[in-house]
Amino acid sequence: MEVCGDLKSDNLKNRPLTPLRILRGLMILLVFLSTAFMFLLYFAPIAALGLRLLSVQQSRKVVSLIFGLWLALWPYLFETVNGTTVVFSGDIIPVEKRVLLIANHRTEVDWMYLWNIALRKGCLGYIKYVLKSSLMKLPIFGWGFHVLEFIPVERKREVDEPVLLQMLSSFKDPQEPLWLALFPEGTDFTEEKCKRSQKFAAEVGLPALSNVLLPKTRGFGVCLEVLHNSLDAVYDLTIAYKPRCPSFMDNVFGTDPSEVHIHVRRVLLKEIPANEAESSAWLMDSFKLKDKLLSDFNAQGKFPNQRPEEELSVLKCIATFAGVISLTVVFIYLTLYSHSCFKVYACLSGTYLTFATYYKFQPSPGCFREDSCKVKNH
């Protein structure tokens, strides 16, 4: 049963793509791309290179503060500008600094709605994703993914496991905030992928799931193996949309979705087996539950145990947009109309970001003396 299709039982409809929405969407794209570009050019060499050579922990704090400000534009766009309602259900989320988030992958923008949770809990700048490595090649955003230390994977176990182990080992400090997001299905849901998943499930004796794909368990196992003793909890999230699943451009133009429903199951680490085989079985059970939740959502139009969450402040939205845009205007002025040293700085910064992203270069204190920087051969 396809949850991404229109829900006939609701009166919600996708908003029409009017000329005004097109104009507003193009302006939003311009604002988001230009602000991301200038923030990365001017802040990344200072926060993610210079400061990181002195202290990785302090560098991460500054990166979180600066780029968390920019990331906040997205939840404000979704909820305050577009008028999308985010409906939470299930367990209440306390303010916790170290969590592993696992979620179903309905569409290409699921991961962006996790920011709506992190913003409310004061951890927006600390959220990191395990994502497919091809996304690191995106112009501008690839730089951002690298600076924010997202973990790129090839979806090949023999290649990905050493990368996961290496990068996760740098996040083991229990005093350092970390929201690590993982989509165990490994790809977004489509009917064709679902049929292939069901065929494979039948061949290996696993349950046939209709609304999610079979999860890949090893990545989850590695995350638990490395971080088990330092995490506060696992947030098991199930995401659904009304009236249909949005694309990235739907979000930009504000046509879809009208509602995002996020069901939360907060699980303590002691409730998840440490043994790899048993933790894999736990994850499989989690996705069987997601499948049932999504079937019920399709029939009833909601998840059980809906609960209120604070609304995002309009004043904070205005202040965030004003602050980010004002800084961007200053950076553009410095680059184009001020002393030539700013042009040189911008060029060197862009060169460094391109190099660092391509070679997965993350500096650390003393790395040039001890040859300990993380650089991968291509």
Curated annotation (Swiss-Prot):
Transmembrane segments: 26-46, 62-82, 317-337
Domain of life: Eukaryota
One Pfam assignment: Acyltransferase
Listed GO biological process terms: CDP-diacylglycerol biosynthetic process
Subcellular location: Membrane
Molecular function GO labels: 1-acylglycerol-3-phosphate O-acyltransferase activity
Tissues where the protein occurs: Widely expressed at low level.
Main location: membrane
Matching InterPro entries: Acyltransf_C, Plipid/glycerol_acylTrfase
Topology versus the membrane: Multi-pass membrane protein
Enzyme Commission identifier(s): 2.3.1.51
This protein's UniProt keywords: Acyltransferase, Lipid biosynthesis, Lipid metabolism, Membrane, Phospholipid biosynthesis, Phospholipid metabolism, Transferase, Transmembrane, Transmembrane helix
Record pathway: Phospholipid metabolism; CDP-diacylglycerol biosynthesis; CDP-diacylglycerol from sn-glycerol 3-phosphate: step 2/3
Reaction equations catalysed: a 1-acyl-sn-glycero-3-phosphate + an acyl-CoA = a 1,2-diacyl-sn-glycero-3-phosphate + CoA
Record flagged with keyword Signal: no
Locus of motif HXXXXD motif: 105-110
GO cellular component: membrane
Family label: Belongs to the 1-acyl-sn-glycerol-3-phosphate acyltransferase family.
Biological role stated in the UniProt entry: May convert lysophosphatidic acid (LPA) into phosphatidic acid by incorporating acyl moiety at the 2 position. Has no activity when expressed in bacteria or yeast.
Protein name: Probable 1-acyl-sn-glycerol-3-phosphate acyltransferase 4
Gene name of the encoded protein: LPAT4
